Amino acid sequence: CLSQASGKDVGALMNTWISQPGYPVVYASLDNGELALRQEQFFTGPHQPSDRLWPIPLDANDQRLPEILKEREQHLSPAPDGLLLLNHQNASHFITCYDDTLRARILQAIASGTLTPSQRAQYLNEQILLARGGLVASSTLVEALAAFQNESDHTVWEIISLAISDLKKFVDQDEAAEKLLRRLSG
């Protein structure tokens, strides 16, 4: 039995995931020296507000964070002062919306080659989904693409291609944005 082997109540963890539709977005933000984590159901179109909660295995690269986010919101102090990645091995079923400070740290790690190809692809894919859902501006996606200027991994380039395709829908009427997108896409 998985519960015996792992020492965790796998049945209770999985029940929520298989009994309710959708999946969550976790907002990660820094506030007065604390890390705030908040979960909501992720939507890409018109929707009614949802009060659904999931037990979310965070799989953070910072071991001080809890293994599972069970509440709607949780605050942790002190906040990590370096790179923070949630779901850093891409093993959980949620997306993360980082605040500007955390996002800037990730983009710096992408530009410097610190993240693995899988982590780079995951981050960019999440940004595409967040832009489609209206949770981040398409300009945030353009900013993210700039960090991939030296990208060499084929899989990551497939995700970059998806991002550029999505962005073309928004920049056709904006000459400055179109020029920037052309410069980024070569």
Predicted regions and their residues:
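Non-catalytic accessory/interaction domains
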Residues: C1-G186
